[in-house]
Amino acid sequence: MHKVLAIETSCDETSVSIVSNIGDTFRIHSNIIASQIEDHSKWGGVVPELAARKHLELLPFVLDKALEEAKIKIEEVDYIASTVAPGLVGCLRVGSITARSLCMLHSKPFLGIHHLEGHLSSILFSENYPKKSFLTLLVSGGHTELIKVDDSRGMQRLGKSFDDAAGEAFDKVGRLLGLSYPGGPAIEKIAKNGDPMKFNLPKCKISDKKGGFLKYDFSFSGLKTAVLRLVERINLTGKTVPIPDIAASFERVVAEVLVDRTIKCAQDHSLDTVVVVGGVAANNTLRKMMISEASKKSIKVHLAPLDLCTDNAAMIGAAALFRIKFKDHFSSLKLGVAGRLSIEQADNLYEETPPF
C-alpha cells in the first residue's frame, strides 16, 4: 500500500489530503478543504494576491488537521505531491514550496501534479471507475475541455473553450443577475423555481478556418452577452426581471451544449464511456441530462463524486498514486510552477531536467 500526502492550492481552496491505494482500490483517509469563498465574494471573484496570502495563513493548520484526521504521522507517508500547474502562480508556489520543503525535511519523493490530471483522477474514488479508454468532460471555473484518456492513461485534448469556461460563465451570469458568489450553486438553486424553456438563448459555435464549425469546442461568452442584453431589454419595459426563468434557461442551454458536444465527440472517436469531472460536474441538471442523453446512444456515464467535483487535494493524491503505480514517475525537487500548461504536457513534470 502506498500513502500519499497531497496539497492543492492552485486557486482559492487550501486543501491537504492523505490517500492510499491497494491494487485498483483507492482510499481517502482525510481530505481537508478550507474555502476562501467568503474572502472573495465581496469582490465577485478570486483576487490572486489575497488568495495566495490566505494559503500561507491556512496551510499549516489544514496540514495538521489532515494528518490528525488520517491518524498518521508525516514520517509514515511514502510520497508527497502538490499541484504545480496550471493555476494562479502565487497560489501554486505556496503549495509547491511547502511540499518540496517537507520532502527535503523527511526524505520523501516528490510528485508535481497537473491540476487537470487531478480532476480526471477524481473518478478513481468512484465505484467501478473505467479501466479502458474513455472521454472526459472536464468542466470547471477555469476550464471546459474534452480529453480522451487511452488504455495506458495517455491524454489528448479533443475540445476546449475559446473564451469563458462554463464555470466562469455561471459566475458572470450570476453576478449579472445579482446572485451570490460563486454563481454556479446560486443559479442552480434559483433555477429550480424557473421555467427552463422560457427564453431561447443561443448555443454559440466556433468557426473553423477551413469552413464550418469546430464541433467539439465551446464558447460561452456570447451566451453571457445574450443574457445581459435580455436583462437590459426587460429593464427598459419597466417589468420585473424574471430571474428564476433566466437562470433556468441559461442553465439548460449550458447543459445542452456540454452534453451534445460530449456525446458527439465520444461517438466520433468510438468511445463508449464518458466521465464528467470538475466543479460544474456537481450541477444536477447537467448530471441528469448527460445520463439521459448518453443512455440513448448506449454510452456509459461515470460522474465524479459530488464532494470531489470542486478543487481538493484528494484528487491530486489520486493522480500521484496513479503515476506511481503505472508509470513510476517522480519529479525533481527543482521543479517550479506554471500558470499555464496543457494536459498533453503533463508528462514533462517528471523529466530529470524540469521544464520550469
Curated annotation (Swiss-Prot):
A GO biological process held by the record: tRNA threonylcarbamoyladenosine modification
Annotated compartments: Cytoplasm
SUPFAM superfamilies referenced in this protein's UniProt entry, alphabetically: Actin-like ATPase domain (SSF53067)
Cofactor detail note: Binds 1 Fe(2+) ion per subunit.
GO MF annotation, one: N(6)-L-threonylcarbamoyladenine synthase activity
Protein family membership: Belongs to the KAE1 / TsaD family.
Protein name according to UniProt: tRNA N6-adenosine threonylcarbamoyltransferase
